[in-house]
Amino acid sequence: MNGQATFSQNWDLDSLLPHPSGDEFRQLLDVFRTDLELLAEESDSLPSLGDPLPEVLERWAVFVEKLDELTRRGTDLDAFIGCHAAADANNRLYQQFEAELSSLGPYRTRLSSAIQFGLQAASDEQLAEMCSGNERLGRIAYWLKDQRSLSKLRLPREQEMLAAEMDVDGLHAWGRLYDRVSGALRIRVMEKGDVVDRSPGQVQFDSADRSVRENNYHASLKAWRSVADTCGDAINHIAGTRLTKYRRLGLEDHLSAPLFFNRMQRETLDAMWSAVENRKEVLLGFLGSKADLLGLDRLGWCDLQAPLPSPDAGGISYDAACELIIESFSRFTPEFGDFARKTIVERWIEVENRDGKRQGGFCTGFPGQQQSRIFMTYVGTLDSMSTLAHEIGHAYHSFVLKEQPLFLQEYPMNLAETASTFAEAVLGEERLAAGQDRHEQLGILDTMLSDAVSFLMNIHSRFLFEDEFHRERVDGEVSPERLSELMVKSQKQAYLDALAEDGWNDTFWISKLHFYISSLPFYNFPYTFGYLLSLGIYAVARDAGSVDFPSRYREFLLATGNRSTEDTVKDSFGYDLREPDFWNRSLDVVADRVRRFVDLASSND
């Protein structure tokens, strides 16, 4: 970066809570633990709502208010330690605090179980009576209904409590182990003639020099293979624990729970993947044209993020990326632009490219502070800028919901990914409209269509892999070698066998942290869902040509906290997600972008 940087690349955590190394934070955590234990004990005697008498409703209202306050504090603590641990992956103190907070999981399970078991006995009529008979409960009527639905994923009370206690040193411990292993991993690469060790997040595959991409790629494969056995244990035991519980619950299959968590019907998931499989062949035109522009017969895995040849092949500074995002969001709506500037200026974002950070990116919320924090590693590419816009989109979603009751600020991951990918769409379309020449427009379209490949092919390969892995895991542990075979098989199917024969990534099951998130299963299809939903919404905005669309979009974001996925879209935009129409509308946008890219790529202007 040339000259003095305008925007800080490091976040401000000190204004949120006391630093973890001090006594004040220790005291804060101890008080939280005590209050959590007391409320968990109180929850054991929470009455059933099978007979919603006025005194019972009042007791529930008071309990839910206490739970609201305690949940805010606990969420802030989790997010705070998570931020510190991500920014300093090898810090043992932060790892210890992560483990300590995880150990409180059984108390939280007691609380959520008490709510769900208490609601389980209530009929629809009783639940409606309950919400109309108490104003405070009426405000969170949808959340109560959703909690009653989630009670189907609960074992009998004593078994549920035992499972929660065992998960601390089982399910969630395997997730934490993966975080430590991947955080400590170093990839040995060549930089400017020197051999250096880099964190996974620092090793990029977007160099204009193919030899650099190939060397980085093969170095990454070698490094990840060195931890294959440990990661194989982790992924097997995470999946195995879940499958054991699913069997005890009598669930249809391993997709039942993810669908519950995403407030989504199986017909919707099937309609989405069916549309993707029927239409994604159009992406072969993009992959072929990009290979031609790069002088290759076929793209390999290391070429998917490669930049196109351009007379202006320089990167984009963090300051420039921030200004572009602010300007693009502001043209959509002043509130969106003002919010983006707020996150950047007030240092809600950590982007510094340095050793010792965890890989990946995230946005995490602090409901007690009504703020968010964003984590990523910015490496000066268009893809980095898109990731930044993506995470700011997440933060804006939380910002819109911040005045709602806490339990109506919770939204499923598929709808969370809609707001973030919509932000990327806003940035991309604004930049494309302002593109000055063929090379610039090709570069913008390349970024957009690389995202399409990620969401419609890469994420699909993850879904196919996890689906088949879970089916095989029912019969016992799956070896690392077999996991690699399943990964390549899934990639070939999802990418329509379009990459070079030696271009498949058999270590992707090891390097992709989404497979190891112990708190949520099948953390893959929400991305494709959110991507296509955001494109469809953007198409509605483009076609409507109405100045009131930003307000409709805001109402859509508010609805994500108090409706099912299908009702959120139906009430906001009038589409039935169980039918192919909306998904095809989204895929029409992708097809149009491919046509524009292929035409520009074949032009000599």
Q: PLM features: residue spans?
A:
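C-terminal, non-catalytic "cap/extension" segments appended to globular domains
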Residues: 4-7, 14, 20, 115-119, ...
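Catalytic zinc-binding patch centered on the HExxH motif and its immediate surroundings
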Residues: 314-316, 349-371
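Long, K/E/R/D-enriched contiguous segments that form extended
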Residues: 293-331, 337, 341, 363, ...
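A well-structured
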Residues: 1-311, 599-604
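Short beta-alpha connecting loops at secondary-structure transitions
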Residues: 373-377, 403-413, 442-451, 470, ...
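Post-HExxH zinc-binding segment in Zn-dependent metallohydrolases
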Residues: 412-440, 448-450, 454, 530
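Active-site recognition of the HExxH zinc-binding catalytic motif
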Residues: 250, 379-399, 420, 425, ...
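Short pre-active-site segment immediately N-terminal to the catalytic Zn-binding motif
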Residues: 313-316, 369-389
